[in-house]
Amino acid sequence: MTTTPCNMNITIRITRSTITFTAPNTVIEGQTDFEQYNMKTGIAVAANLRQALAECHILKAQSAPGRLQEQAVPSQYHPVFDTATVFVDTPLLLIPAEEFDAETMPQLYHYANTKHQQDDVEGTPINQINVVAAYAVGKDLRFVLTEMFRNVKFMPLLAPILVEFCRRSYGGFQEKLFCYFHDKRVDMFAFRKGRVRFCSSFEVSLTPDAAYFILNVWQTLGMKPSDVLCLAGSITGQEALLK
């Protein structure tokens, strides 16, 4: 007997250091399963992903009781998880929705991010802040995913972060600079009247590096001592940073 997919979704989050899997438990209703794979250094992200998929206990489930049907042709795809929503951590290019052009998006992105010339470019609307987020998806990464899942939906890792920061930017008369720390990097955002005012990313291995970039952006935006600095994420040396 062969099986058809159960139209279930698995969420895959790919960062520089980890790959995580989140999915509804196929046996216990209402329970969510979570699994993390640590990236191996020295091999490509796509190779890490292939290994993570092979080792993932969530994906090793071969059936979902009571939800499988017979089909005439064997399927190459996973028998339980029909769709994968994949969050990727590649540089963002935020394009105002009113200026977005799907045909010119790849050219604009590759011009701004020269290290991703060979990658595909995806665009995801973020309606809450009226932009389209352009970001890179490696061809090898896409191939590995489409081998296993019938439907693959890509999303930028920072999309929900942007929406939450924009929501928190309202209220009060002070300007706010938001800093999100992760994977030895800090992403900085500023908003005004629900629109993105500033968006950039900086490599930060040491606390003094983070302090330098934050102060530089603060001064560039003309922010005052009475304005608000918001820090989030995995912050190394937080006490030293706040001195």
Locations of the language-model features?
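Hydrophobic beta-strand segments of well-ordered beta-sheets in folded domains
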Residues: I10, P79-V86, L177, P225-G233
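Small-residue (GG/TT-enriched) beta-loop-alpha framework at ligand/catalytic clefts
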Residues: M8, R13-T22, E29-G30, Y37, ...
